[in-house]
Amino acid sequence: MPKMKTKSSAKKRFKVTGSGKIKRKHAFKSHILTKKSKKRKLALTHSALVHKTDEKSIKQQLRII
């Protein structure tokens, strides 16, 4: 049986840290930025961790499990 392919969309959106947690980027940072404050845009720049309820499905898409 051939190897399972990872989901390309998940591969582009998520990175796994050394401890096994999954990092993601924030949404709402691509356009219509004039009405958003500098503080809000700066906060959206930083990466965040995926919530634990979503970790299992993302790991399946990345073929980690």
UniProtKB/Swiss-Prot annotation:
SUPFAM superfamilies: L35p-like (SSF143034). GO terms for cellular component: cytosolic large ribosomal subunit. InterPro entries: Ribosomal_bL35 (IPR001706), Ribosomal_bL35-like (IPR021137), Ribosomal_bL35_CS (IPR018265), Ribosomal_bL35_sf (IPR037229). Keywords: Ribonucleoprotein, Ribosomal protein. One of its GO terms (molecular function) is structural constituent of ribosome. Pfam families: Ribosomal_L35p. It comes from the Bacteria. Residues 1-22 are annotated as: Disordered. GO terms for biological process: translation. Belongs to the bacterial ribosomal protein bL35 family. PANTHER family: 54S RIBOSOMAL PROTEIN BL35M, LARGE RIBOSOMAL SUBUNIT PROTEIN BL35M. NCBIfam families: rpmI_bact. This is Large ribosomal subunit protein bL35. It comes from Flavobacterium johnsoniae (strain ATCC 17061 / DSM 2064 / JCM 8514 / BCRC 14874 / CCUG 350202 / NBRC 14942 / NCIMB 11054 / UW101) (Cytophaga johnsonae). The lineage of its organism: Bacteria, Pseudomonadati, Bacteroidota, Flavobacteriia, Flavobacteriales.
